[in-house]
C-alpha cells in the first residue's frame, strides 16, 4: 500500500483514522490529566469549527493561535484544518515585540489566545483587548478583533499545496520568519510511524516540546 496516496487530505482526517474501529480509544490526555477519546475530540473540533466560522473565519484565512500546549490549542488547530484555514501557531512565551512582528507579517483574520492555561497568552490578549468567547468542549478562549482587511489565501484541493500550519522560526537575523507546512507533509510525518511499525496504536507519546515548534507539532 502506497503511503502517500492513502494519506488523509487534511490533518483533521488523522483523527478520523484514529477513531476507526474504536472511537472510544484515548487520543490525548490533556494538561489537567483528563483523557480525551477520539470521539470526544472529533466532536469538540467540529463544534469549534462552527464557532470559528461564526466569528468570521473563512477558508484560506490565517488564524493566529497564541498558546502553550493544551487541549484548547489542539482543538483550534484541527478546527482550522476543517475550515481550510491556515493555523499560525505561536508560543505564548514569545515577546510582545515578536508577536507584533508576526501579526504584521501574516495578517491573521483573528487571533485566538489560550488564556485559561497560560498567563503569557492572557497578557498578550489583554494588551490586544481580546474578548472572551465560549467554545463548547474546551471552555473560554480570548479572541482578538476581526481584521476585515485580511485577504484569504486560495484554497487548494491538493493536500501538497494547501497550507495547514505556519511555524515562525527565530531566524538568523532575530526577526521571525514563517515556514509554511502543507497538509500532506504533516500527515506524512504523522502516519509514517504506523507504516514502519515504529509507532503502534497502544503506544503513549509524551509531548514536551511546544506544538508551536515543528518537532512538538
Please identify what each model-predicted range represents:
Residues 77, 94-123, 141, 146, ...:
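Conserved ATP-dependent adenylate/AMP-binding module captured primarily in the ANL superfamily
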Residues 116-160:
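ANL superfamily adenylate-forming
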Residues 8-9, 23-24, 147-168, 175, ...:
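Conserved pre-ATP/AMP-binding loop-to-beta segment of ANL
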Residues 3-27:
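A short N-terminal helical cap/helix-turn-helix that marks the beginning
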Residues 35-39, 164-188:
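Conserved AMP-binding A3 loop
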Residues 7, 24-57, 61-70, 74-78, ...:
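Conserved AMP-binding/adenylate-forming core of the ANL superfamily
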Residues 42-47, 179-200, 205-209, 215:
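Conserved structural elements of the adenylate-forming
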Residues 78-83, 105, 213:
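Short hydrophobic alpha-helices that are characteristic scaffold elements of the AMP-binding
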